[in-house]
């Protein structure tokens, strides 16, 4: 496992993690590489690509997290929700995905890496309305016009949605009905080698949704 490569990339982005968090991240990357050979969870085929294309922007999200319970929709191979649980193991995290092989992988990671505050649910986000989460995260799940109403049932009344977005963000914002949101901010994320423009959209849904 390229520990030195991971540490150098974290240093580039001024991300500081303690030794236990680094060990959990290494364990996660090892599990993902092993499962990926059999189940094709992600297109990345080497650890360096996983780090650059998936892990780093998930870690950057931490800077914008409010306190409280977190739900991650469309968790897939664990980005960003499982990654955030790995570096904040005391936070309550619920990982949501409709794909059975991906939820099995997420449960295996939670078990092997000792993430006792992680729950995994196999479901579509639109089907869940029993949430009281302080924050919902999403990465490459759906356009904002779909994502905001689709996650409203998961959020506490003052909860926030944090959505990782890329090159099409201006198009998505132009297509977003103003009535859907009460507040919205776009945070430019640090440039990561091998990626295009990335940003984090933080918003609160309108109360009438």
Swiss-Prot record:
The lineage of its organism: Bacteria, Pseudomonadati, Pseudomonadota, Gammaproteobacteria, Chromatiales. Transmembrane segments: none annotated. One of its GO terms (molecular function) is rRNA (guanine-N7-)-methyltransferase activity. Belongs to the methyltransferase superfamily. RNA methyltransferase RsmG family. SUPFAM superfamilies: S-adenosyl-L-methionine-dependent methyltransferases. This is Ribosomal RNA small subunit methyltransferase G. It is an enzyme of class 2 (transferase). The keyword Methyltransferase applies. It catalyses: guanosine(527) in 16S rRNA + S-adenosyl-L-methionine = N(7)-methylguanosine(527) in 16S rRNA + S-adenosyl-L-homocysteine. It comes from Halorhodospira halophila (strain DSM 244 / SL1) (Ectothiorhodospira halophila (strain DSM 244 / SL1)). InterPro entries: rRNA_ssu_MeTfrase_G, SAM-dependent_MTases_sf. S-adenosyl-L-methionine binds at residues 74, 79, 139. Specifically methylates the N7 position of guanine in position 527 of 16S rRNA.
């Amino acid at each position: 496992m390229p520990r030195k490569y991971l540490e150098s990339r974290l240093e580039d982005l001024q991300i500081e993690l303690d030794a236990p968090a680094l060990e959990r991240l290494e364990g996660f990357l090892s599990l993902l590489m092993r499962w990926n050979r059999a189940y094709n969870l992600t297109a990345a085929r080497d650890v360096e690509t996983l780090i650059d294309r998936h892990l780093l922007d998930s870690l950057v999200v931490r800077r914008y997290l409010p306190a409280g319970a977190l739900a991650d929709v469309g968790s897939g191979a664990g980005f960003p929700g499982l990654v955030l649980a790995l570096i904040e193991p005391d936070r309550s995290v619920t990982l949501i995905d409709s794909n059975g092989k991906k939820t099995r992988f997420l449960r295996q990671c939670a078990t092997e890496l000792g993430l006792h505050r992680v729950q995994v649910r196999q479901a579509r986000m639109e089907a869940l309305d029993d949430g009281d989460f302080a924050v919902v995260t999403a990465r490459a799940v759906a356009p904002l016009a779909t994502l905001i109403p689709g996650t409203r049932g998961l959020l506490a009344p003052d909860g926030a949605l944090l959505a990782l977005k890329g090159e099409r963000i201006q198009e998505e914002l132009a297509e977003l009905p103003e009535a859907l949101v009460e507040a919205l901010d776009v945070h430019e994320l640090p440039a990561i080698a091998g990626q295009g423009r990335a940003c984090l959209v933080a918003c609160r849904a309108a109360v009438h949704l």
